[in-house]
Amino acid sequence: MQNINRTIGQASSFGNKKLRAYTNFVMIYLKSFHIPSESEENGFFIDYSGNNKLTCYNSFYPFQVFPAKGLSDMTFSEITIFAGGNGSGKSTLLNIITERLGISRTSLYNKTDFHSMYMPLCSGEFGIYDRTQMRELMSVSKFITSDDVLSHLLDVREKNDNLDFKRKIWLENRREYIINPGQGPREIDMDDPESIRKYREFNEQINTSRSFSQTLRRNIGTNERTFSNGETAIKYFSDKIEPGGLYILDEPENSLSSEYQIDLAKFIESMARFYDCQFIISSHSPFFLSMKGAKIYDLDAQPASVKKWTEIPNMKLLKDFFVEHNDEF
């Protein structure tokens, strides 16, 4: 716990980035978002089917997902959470908001032929109108998915594995050069960069005046510092989340133990309160749903509605489970 708290603390200092003066009140950049209602979707299909045959499609996604939930207009707080079970539309809603607002993202997602027709029917209302402020906001805002975190974990592991392999080969070559010096380059062509590189590498490999560690760092590089998967995941979030941004997080609890979920939830609360960040999150974790100031949409409800975190069915299920096993604690 101590190590990861220190990691978050270091990350939240934002290195050498210059911080502007932050406000003492929460920032709500995205005030509301509209997705097409049932009547709007019906109007689209009437107009579209007039000139097109729809019998070749068995899905009109993302159409026909949210009208049954009675969800059309949403308003946001500094932290807004979409809660619901698998297939409730949490990730779909985040993808729609991200694409319509043009927020930066790394991971791709599957689109159907109807995405380009659905997006013009969606709209968002921002609380800032100055173009410079809007550019600043969009320059730091991000959509972060659980796939992004997993990809980062794998990238770090692959990078370190590659460096370890190169280091092993380099040391084997050095050992061979020392045992059999004649295997090194016999001459150097000063007009050939590759010849110069090979001669310099050979010279460094047999030169004992330079320490092994210095030579290896110069020629191979250094491994990225490794943490546990949970520590690496939470550090990824703290590195990506900067002051003054709108951040959309898709199930950030993935890859995190309960302990690290609590740490990340506290970090998000702090960024919203003190560093002018706004968050829109999909989650079914009690540690995120219980964050202070969070506005929660229950997408499993009919119609979808705002609820207290203790009213979410999954939270009631967890409570009943622990009450049932209370004597075992």
What residues fall within each predicted segment?
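Internal, charge-rich low-complexity segments
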Residues: 154-185
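Loop/turn-to-beta-strand initiation segments
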Residues: 244-246, 275-280
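Phosphate-binding P-loop
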Residues: 68-77, 240-242
